[in-house]
Amino acid sequence: MAPKKDVKKPAAAAAPAPAPAPAPAPAPAKPKEEKIDLSAIKIEFSKEQQDEFKEAFLLYDRTGDSKITLSQVGDVLRALGTNPTNAEVKKVLGNPSNEEMNAKKIEFEQFLPMLQAISNNKDQGTYEDFVEGLRVFDKEGNGTVMGAELRHVLATLGEKMKEEEVEALMAGQEDSNGCINYEAFVKHIMSI
């Protein structure tokens, strides 16, 4: 008898090697922060206005050196009738760190172009913009929003307000059902 041949089972087809993982998508580039060149801003305020602004500026000087910290700039801007967001204030300051906000100081001459830049910004919301924004919360379509819901929105969304600020803003605005006529509310806010 002939010797048995080793019958080998055909080798199982090797599984195809997994395709290499695709290269990770490059991280999206951060949008370049627009720098505001304060030296290029033309001061359009009258001498009298500048004197009034300086007087207000100096009220915030805590050390008597005719300077304020960067963290006070937003307060002074708002005291002078502008209404910049915190982001706009940081942008006009050159996006300083939190440490710099409390440590760095500026003089009135450095502040004035910042005030002019903020004053020139025409991106402020209009009455219609605010009413339209609040209409989203008008579930019944009757011109009112729930006071509790508005409190929550003001304290948690966008430029968050402190609870005391919300209460001061909403004082006397709610009806007996806890609802607020948002058109009257916007008129009230814009008159402050």
UniProtKB/Swiss-Prot annotation:
Record PTM Phosphoserine, positions in chain: S71, S97
This protein's UniProt keywords: Acetylation, Methylation, Motor protein, Muscle protein, Myosin, Phosphoprotein, Repeat
GO molecular-function terms, A-Z: calcium ion binding; structural constituent of muscle
UniProt-listed SUPFAM superfamilies: EF-hand (SSF47473)
Pro residues: bias regions: 17-29
Keyword Phosphoprotein among record annotations: yes
Annotated positions of the N,N,N-trimethylalanine modification: A2
PROSITE patterns: EF_HAND_2
SMART domains: EFh
Gene3D superfamilies found in the cross-reference section: EF-hand
Keyword Thylakoid: no
Domain of life of the native organism: Eukaryota
Subunit composition and interactions: Myosin is a hexamer of 2 heavy chains and 4 light chains. Does not bind calcium.
Protein name: Myosin light chain 1/3, skeletal muscle isoform
Name of encoding gene: MYL1
